[in-house]
Amino acid sequence: MSNRDITLAYQNVRGLNTKTHEFYKAVSSCDYDVVAITETWIQDGVCDSELFGDSYIVYRRDRDLNALNVSKGGGVLIGVKQNLISNKIDLSNLVTQLPAVDVVGCRMVINGKTIYLFVIYIQPN
């Protein structure tokens, strides 16, 4: 990849379950390199391809609703364009210790430099 700027979009979507088609169209119509989302409210029933197609690698952390005894909420994700080098950061120890904190992280190599991106959502009390 040649040296260039990257574009990043962030949004708190407050639930994607009923907005997957609109979200997919919005992401498809833009050319962001990285998309960071909080409050996805999604679970295993929603596939990454419903949100991003095949042009992004998706790293996500869905909220464990059973562990927190809630019916919805939380969740974070990062979508990284396929042409960027990236991999998920293992945060399983942190997630175990802080189940009410939704966090996902990835490591990217951009223009020869390593960048770490974390998306964190802490629900208000």
Each model region followed by its residue ranges:
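A shared catalytic/ligand-binding motif for oxyanion handling
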Residues: M1-N125
